[in-house]
C-alpha cells in the first residue's frame, strides 16, 4: 500500500521522486533525529550486543545525556518486565522481548514524534496491552504518534485520526469519530424473543435489504437510503425482540467499501 515506504521517506532512508517532506519543521528527519523515535517493522537490534549496551549505544546516537541514559534504561526495562535481561545478548531474547527492547530504543530520547511501524508484531495479548498503554502514555505526555498497521482493529484502539493508503494513494484522512459518523453501519442485530421466529415479517419491510440468522440472533441489513436510526423501531415492531442494536461499522468495513467502490472517502 505504501505505509512503510512513506515512513522510510520521512526518516530519510528513502527519498521521494518528487515533492518534499517536512518533519518537525525540517525537510529531512536527520536534522531533527534527536526529537524523533522510530520503531521499524523489521528487527533492528544488534544481536551480539548486550541489551543494556545496545540501548546505551542508541541513546548516545540520540544525544541522551550520560547522567540520564542509564537511569532511563533501568526504568524502562523494569516497566516492560525485562529488568533481568540487561546483561543478556539481544540474540538470546525471544521475538516479543526484542520488540519491547526496540520500543525502549525508540522512546529513550523522549521524542516529540514517535513513529511506530507494526509495533505489536510478535507480542502476545498481555504484552500488546502493555505496549498500547505505554503508547497512550507517550501521547498524554505530548508526543505525536505516527502508527502504521494493516490490522484495522489496532488502529481503532490506538488512533484519534486515520489515514488510509491503497495502492500508494491516500483514500481516507479524517478523525476516527468523523469516519464513524460518515460511514454509519446499515446493519442491525436483534435477539428475537422466539429464536425460531419466521423472518418473513422482516423481509417484507421495504426498508430491509435482507435478514439473516446468526445463531440465536438475527442480522438485518437496511437499504442504502434508510437511516439506521429509523430502522431500529421498524425492526422492533416487526419482530418481538429482547434487544435491537446498531452494528457499528469497523475500519475494516470502511476500507473494504472504499476499495470496492474505487473512490476516496
Regions found by a protein language model. Give the residues of each.
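Conserved ABC transporter NBD signature motif
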Residues: 19-32
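Conserved catalytic motifs of ABC-family nucleotide-binding domains
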Residues: 110
Amino acid at each position: 500500500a505504501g505505509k512503510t515506504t512513506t515512513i522510510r521517506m520521512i526518516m530519510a532512508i528513502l527519498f521521494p521522486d518528487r515533492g518534499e517532506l517536512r518533519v518537525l519543521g525540517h525537510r529531512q528527519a536527520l536534522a531533527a533525529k534527536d526529537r524523533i523515535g522510530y520503531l521499524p517493522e523489521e528487527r533492528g537490534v544488534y544481536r551480539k550486543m548486550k541489551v543494556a549496551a545496545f540501548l546505551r549505544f542508541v541513546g548516545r546516537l540520540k544525544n541522551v545525556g550520560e547522567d540520564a541514559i542509564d537511569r532511563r534504561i533501568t526504568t524502562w526495562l523494569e516497566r516492560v518486565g525485562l529488568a533481568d535481561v540487561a546483561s543478556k545478548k539481544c540474540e538470546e531474547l525471544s521475538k516479543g522481548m526484542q520488540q519491547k527492547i526496540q520500543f525502549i530504543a525508540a522512546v529513550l530520547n523522549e521524542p516529540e514524534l514517535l513513529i511506530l511501524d507494526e509495533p505489536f508484531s510478535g507480542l502476545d495479548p498481555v504484552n500488546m496491552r502493555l505496549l498500547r498503554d505505554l503508547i497512550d502514555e507517550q501521547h498524554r505526555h505530548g508526543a505525536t504518534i505516527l502508527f502504521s498497521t494493516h490490522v484495522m482493529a489496532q488502529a481503532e484502539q490506538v488512533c484519534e485520526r486515520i489515514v488510509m493508503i491503497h495502492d500508494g494513494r491516500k483514500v481516507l484522512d479524517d478523525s476516527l469519530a468523523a469516519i464513524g459518523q460518515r460511514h454509519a453501519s446499515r446493519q442491525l442485530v436483534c435477539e428475537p424473543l422466539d429464536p425460531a421466529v419466521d423472518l418473513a415479517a422482516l423481509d417484507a419491510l421495504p426498508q430491509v435489504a435482507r435478514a439473516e440468522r446468526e445463531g440465536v440472533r438475527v442480522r438485518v441489513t437496511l437499504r442504502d437510503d434508510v437511516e439506521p436510526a429509523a430502522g431500529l423501531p421498524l425492526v422492533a415492531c416487526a419482530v418481538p425482540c429482547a434487544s435491537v442494536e446498531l452494528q457499528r461499522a469497523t475500519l475494516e468495513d470502511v476500507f473494504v467499501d472504499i476499495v470496492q467502490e474505487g473512490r476516496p472517502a
